[in-house]
Amino acid sequence: MNEADDQQEIIRLEQARCRALVEADIDSLQKLVSDDVVHVHANGKTDNKAAYLAMVGTQIRFLEAGREALDVRVYGNTAIATGRLDQLIEMTQTAQRIDMHVMTTQVWVRHGANWQQASFQATNL
């Protein structure tokens, strides 16, 4: 693959990750994020893979998750993706809905032929 193909693949995978959040598709998320992922929420809370998947499966319902333009820079087997992420979530315990608008930085790492998200950082807009 060339750099342009890798950029498009990261964009496709991020779209798949957003879709998996809305569908609560834990199996797909399991494949998309690396075992050592560090997921930093906009409030500063940090999750490892197990905590991130548990949060998606039990604590938050993603009603919408969408991306505006995503800028992807590829450095060999590492890619950095930055862009705006808009989400409408519902807290499962309280049914409180939160409309979130964040800027994210993600690090994707290629393991063999597959890319996985190794880091996610969100900042409220």
Label the model's feature ranges.
Residues 1-31, 36-125:
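A beta-strand edge to alpha-helix "cap/lid" segment located at domain peripheries
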